[in-house]
Regions:
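Hydrophobic alpha-helical transmembrane segments of multi-pass integral membrane proteins
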Residues: 1-212
Length: 212
């Protein structure tokens, strides 16, 4: 335990740096003085905050819960992606690391699913798959504004899955869980629909949020 704790704290450092970089890029977007200025920092504000900061924290929490050594590669890859994004290295390298990190996060959920086939895990897996889809689109040079529905679905479904997990203690029926799963599928489909029609994607995402 004494050995594991410093290791986990080390993995938190890139996430904390991603938060600071995200706040720095927010100042740049507002046209205010910022401690750090680079050519691409303001352009990657969204991915820094969602993929690098929140993604690292969520992946680390999942890795700790899973317990396997390879699960820690997910937060490590996401944190490394953040460090590379702020370095002179090509952004493509950072994007590749983030894609790998979310691919591993999906693998973590799949591994847990084999042992515990629960609806809340399915919802969280949909969230991780949304992040992976968004990261792949970012790697394919899709503009960041078009990634917003994917990043939103990642956070919404992750939080929804955790809420379903916590509420299981007070429920005697599975119907609310099943309802949450079908709503999660709607939210999961919305970003893909937004690639075809931004308006309809927003409408479907809004309906999904109302359903929650």
């Amino acid at each position: 335990m004494k050995t594991a704790t410093p290791f986990r704290l080390t993995l938190l450092i890139p996430g904390g740096l991603a938060l600071l970089a995200g706040l720095d890029s927010a100042l740049l977007l507002l046209g205010l003085p910022a401690p750090l200025t680079t050519n691409r920092l303001a352009d990657i504000h969204g991915p820094l905050m969602v993929f690098a900061f929140l993604g690292t924290l969520i992946a680390l929490e999942r890795a700790v819960a899973h317990g396997a050594w390879w699960a820690y590669l997910a937060p490590a890859a996401l944190g490394a992606g953040r460090l590379v994004a702020l370095s002179p290295l090509p952004l493509l390298v950072a994007q590749g690391l983030i894609v790998g990190g979310f691919g591993l996060q999906v693998a973590i959920y799949r591994s847990v699913w084999r042992r515990h086939q629960q609806i809340y895990l399915a919802i969280q897996t949909l969230g991780a798959a949304s992040a992976l889809g968004g990261a792949l689109l970012w790697l394919a040079d899709v503009p960041v504004p078009r990634l917003v529905p994917w990043m939103a679905a990642y956070l919404i479904l992750t939080i929804a899955g955790e809420r379903v997990e916590l509420s299981r203690l007070a429920r005697t029926s599975q119907r609310p869980e099943q309802h949450a799963f079908w709503i999660a599928l709607v939210i999961f489909a919305a970003p893909a629909l937004a690639l075809i029609s931004a308006q309809w994607g927003q409408i479907v995402l809004g309906l999904g949020l109302l359903g929650l």
